């Protein structure tokens, strides 16, 4: 399984969701679409680009959280267990220990570095993944093809990832 899960295309329903999102009035004035390189996000971004006419660029570091930095997990159950461990540890390795998953600190640093590159621009749409986007704005869940507005500032404090 490993990283192969990131290579699956959108389902027919996913294509319909992307097309519906592309017609949302909030995207009518976008100037640039910045996408994750992972297949479903990139396919969503391409659909939005085609419908809105906005140019599309890919940012390699805008990808989803990495549940296994070795890319060797082999089952869905193993991926779920890694995610549960991440949540149990609140995204950080216990003192003196390491885990296979990417820490919240590393995820946040990676995604914010991408957002920082575009912070000076107006009308930028990021197409990425729930866990990655949750590092930029406090929110519990991000739906498929959901539009979440954010007035990003590189100096803003880190958002809350979990309810306290």
Positions of PLM-derived features:
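Generic beta-sheet signal
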Residues: 120-130
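Short beta-strand scaffold positions
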Residues: 35-36, 109, 127-128
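A short, acidic, amphipathic alpha-helical segment used as a generic capping/interface helix at domain edges
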Residues: 107-120
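Acidic, low-complexity terminal tails and accessory targeting/binding regions
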Residues: 57-58, 64-79, 120, 134-164
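Glycine-rich phosphate-binding loop signature in dinucleotide/nucleotide-binding domains
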Residues: 26-29, 118-122
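Catalytic metal-binding/acid-base residues of hydrolase active sites
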Residues: 39, 62, 131-132
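Active-site-proximal alpha-helix that buttresses catalytic centers in soluble enzyme cores
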Residues: 1-56
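Phosphate-handling substructures
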Residues: 4, 8-9, 50-109, 161-162
């Amino acid at each position: 399984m490993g990283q192969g899960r990131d290579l699956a295309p959108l389902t027919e329903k996913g294509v319909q969701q992307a097309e519906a999102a592309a017609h949302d009035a909030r995207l009518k004035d976008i100037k640039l679409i910045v996408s994750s390189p992972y297949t479903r996000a990139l396919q969503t971004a391409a659909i939005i680009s085609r419908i809105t006419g906005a140019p599309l660029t890919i940012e390699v570091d805008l990808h989803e959280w990495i549940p296994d930095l070795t890319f060797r997990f082999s089952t869905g159950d193993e991926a779920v267990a890694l995610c549960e461990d991440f949540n149990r540890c609140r995204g950080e390795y216990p003192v003196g220990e390491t885990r296979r998953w990417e820490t919240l600190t590393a995820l946040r640093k990676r995604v914010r570095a991408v957002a920082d590159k575009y912070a000076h621009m107006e009308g930028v749409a990021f197409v990425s993944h729930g866990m990655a986007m949750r590092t930029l704005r406090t929110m519990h869940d991000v739906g498929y093809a959901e539009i979440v507005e954010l007035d990003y500032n590189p100096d803003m404090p880190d958002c809350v990832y979990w309810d306290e």
